[in-house]
Amino acid sequence: MLRRRVVALSVFVLFGAASFANAQAPEGGGARAGAPAPGGAAQGARAGGGPARRPALFFREEWKQNEKSDEHPITQESVANANLELKLYGPNAKEMDITGKAGDENNPIHVWAGLCTGPCAVLLRDKASYADLSGLARIRWNTKMSGYHQIRPIVKLADGTMYVGDRADGSTRDWIVSEINFADLKWLKMDPAKSVTTGNIVDKIDLSKVDEVGFVDLMPGSGHGAGGWVDVAQIELYANKVAR
């Protein structure tokens, strides 16, 4: 009787061990324990395999003062980068000014939109290349605001269509450097003549061939003194180049 009990107990233990081993084994020959879940490591990877790569600097603009270093209307002469063309949009865009001093981090050379009596946009166009803003392309800028004003990224595609991103940047406390990744944005079309948004929000647009890139302030300025305006100093765009 005792022998039968020992045999039965041994069979029970062996059966339990086999069941535990089967439970731990991956189904269908899958990855071993501790391996990343399917697709987990591939998030953000390029179509050809491997991690997505951050694009190099496409352009940098620091703006250029005149000989007097005073406040004056922005023109093509205000662009320090010889490879870039200045593009202004909005009925009052020519009311934007350049001010500030070179080498002064408390008052760097910058675009000031305080005199814009309506929405105003500033875009930059590379003479030789379109910008591919897909993937990990991003824009970095040094800005300061007054009141509730903020700037938003704006793009003009190769077909002439213009879009404004749904993210806004700006701090009223001090100059702040911030970045926006284009892949994170949703978009609204912009009427270039009025610098106002139109239509419904678009989740994704084709950013593989962008003609111009810049910023827009969708609120009118309040003039000199505290109230409502935007300051935009250095701008850096990180994107791949596409020949024109």
Regions found by a protein language model. Give the residues of each.
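Bacterial N-terminal signal peptides
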Residues: A8-A18
